[in-house]
Structure formats: structure tokens, C-alpha cells
A protein has these predicted regions:
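Short acidic-glycine-tyrosine-enriched beta hairpin
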Residues: 107-128
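Short histidine-centered beta-strand/loop micro-motifs
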Residues: 60-64, 83-88, 105, 114-115, ...
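His/acidic/aromatic-lined binding-pocket segments of jelly-roll/cupin-type domains
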Residues: 74-75, 85-87, 91-96, 114-115, ...
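A short, N-terminal "cap"/entry segment at the start of jelly-roll beta-barrel domains
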Residues: 1-69, 161-166
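Glycine- and acidic-residue-biased ligand/ion/polar-headgroup-sensing regions
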Residues: 78-79, 89-108
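Histidine-centered metal-chelating micro-motifs
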Residues: 82-84, 102, 121-133
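A short hydrophobic beta-strand segment most commonly corresponding to one strand
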Residues: 93-95, 123-124, 138-158
């Protein structure tokens, strides 16, 4: 935990004794680390680990004072490759911090859309929709993306079930 956190002593002592949550156990089971901090100097230089299920390299970031309610992650898609298709029961905002590529989003009704993005793009993945990201850059390390869950959705949603959104 950061030494300059402005929290009450009571809250700080709770953080010291806080047990693992299903969410933190899931991150560990995925083979990834959670980097606790208030500030990351350069998202392009944080150490990443292979994320086998997704097919890229990643690390989760956690704002110290909010615990896991404001997690986000940095992910790198290998050059000329794609991440495995997947869906999630949380909202996700994506800020592209390097490279270029495309994303395909689809729902169970068959509606499908593909769009391109590049460095500086910001877009959202609709709740519970399938999606797949593609790196259109041919250089190693060309694409690093910061994915942030809107309003801390991912850790908090847990097992809530949501209706499929229309694209």
C-alpha cells in the first residue's frame, strides 16, 4: 500500500487484515499480478506476464484506497495477432496507448460490428457481448492497451446476471 494514502487509521488497518476475495483469487489463477498503486508513471513500461486464456500479455492495476473496486489492466496483443474471443458480465472502457488494430463485437442474436482503432482511441465494449481484438501492427510491442472497467464493474459484479445488450 502506498505510504502517502489519505485514509483513516481504522480503514488502513482493515486493508492490512483483508482476506483474499474471489476476484483476487481469480486474477492469481489467471497467472497475473495485481500492481497496487495510486499512480503509474508509464503504462507502456509496466511488467507484463503471459495471459494464456486471452493470448496476450497483461498486468492488473489496483488503486490502493479503493481496493479492487477500481481495477484496470494493461494488455499487449502480440504483433499481427489477436486475443482470444471472449465476453464478460462487466462493462469495459478501452484506451489504446499504442499501436493500431480492430475489434469485432457481436451478440447472441447475430448482430456483428467491426471497427478500427489506433493510438489514443477510447471505446467501450457493451455488457455481455462477445468481442475479439486484433493487432494490426507488425512490430513487436507495438500495441499496448489499457482496459479499465467503468465504475469498477468487474470486481463488483461477481455473479450478477445481465441481459444481452443489443449492439
Amino acid at each position: 500500500m502506498a505510504k502517502n494514502a489519505v485514509v483513516s487509521e481504522e480503514l488502513a488497518s482493515k486493508f492490512k487484515t483483508e482476506k483474499e476475495t474471489p476476484y483476487t483469487r481469480w486474477v492469481k489463477s489467471e497467472g497475473l499480478d495485481i500492481l497496487p498503486s495510486f499512480y503509474v508513471r508509464n503504462l507502456k513500461t509496466v511488467a507484463l506476464k503471459p495471459w494464456a486464456r486471452r493470448g496476450g500479455n497483461a498486468v492488473f492495476l489496483n488503486h490502493d484506497a479503493s481496493r479492487t473496486s477500481n481495477d484496470c489492466y494493461v494488455m499487449e496483443i502480440p504483433p499481427g495477432k489477436s486475443l482470444a474471443p471472449h465476453r464478460q458480465l462487466y462493462e469495459e472502457m478501452i484506451l489504446v496507448i499504442g499501436g493500431r488494430g480492430s475489434t469485432t463485437v457481436w451478440n447472441d442474436a447475430g448482430a456483428r460490428i467491426t471497427f478500427e482503432w489506433k493510438d489514443g482511441a477510447l471505446f467501450a465494449i457493451p455488457l455481455n457481448c462477445h468481442h475479439q481484438h486484433f493487432n494490426g501492427s507488425g512490430r513487436a510491442g507495438a500495441l499496448r492497451r489499457r482496459h479499465q472497467c467503468a465504475a469498477g464493474d468487474q470486481p463488483l459484479r461477481g455473479s450478477r446476471i445481465h441481459l444481452q445488450h443489443q449492439i
